[in-house]
Amino acid sequence: MAFDKDAFLTALDSMTVLELNDLVEAIEEKFGVSAAAMAAPAAGGAAGGGAAAAEEKTEFNVVLADAGANKVAVIKAVREITGLGLKEAKDLVDGAPKNVKEGIAKADAEAAVKKLVEAGAKAELK
């Protein structure tokens, strides 16, 4: 049996979303595969365990767990990291535990945690 790719693509193009969904289910059943694993490979890594998920994670949150004894230095560090004004930074420090920065790269997050710890705060990378 000859296979014509152009005819197949034309047939796919004319299908509705429901028909495409049925086709995907039929392919999964026939060949014993899962479309979810192909569509989202990162999701499979997250299900593999905490260590694998931590290695693949690309966005991190910097959490101020406790301001410590030297609140003034911590407020200055928060202002440097976030660009917040004095009142906003003070409110953030007083309301600990709070997220200082969210969704940032690992290197930036580690630098922010280091700066907060050097100022006397307890900070975490999540």
Curated annotation (Swiss-Prot):
Keyword Ribonucleoprotein carried by entry: yes
Q: Entry's CDD domains?
A: Ribosomal_L7_L12
GO CC term (a single one): cytosolic large ribosomal subunit
A Pfam family per the record = Ribosomal_L12
Q: Per UniProt, which keywords does this protein have?
A: Ribonucleoprotein, Ribosomal protein
Gene3D superfamilies per UniProt? 3.30.1390.10, Single helix bin (1.20.5.710)
Provide a Gene Ontology MF annotation, just one: structural constituent of ribosome
Classification via PANTHER family: 39S RIBOSOMAL PROTEIN L12, LARGE RIBOSOMAL SUBUNIT PROTEIN BL12M
Q: How does it assemble?
A: Homodimer. Part of the ribosomal stalk of the 50S ribosomal subunit. Forms a multimeric L10(L12)X complex, where L10 forms an elongated spine to which 2 to 4 L12 dimers bind in a sequential fashion. Binds GTP-bound translation factors.
The protein here is known as Large ribosomal subunit protein bL12
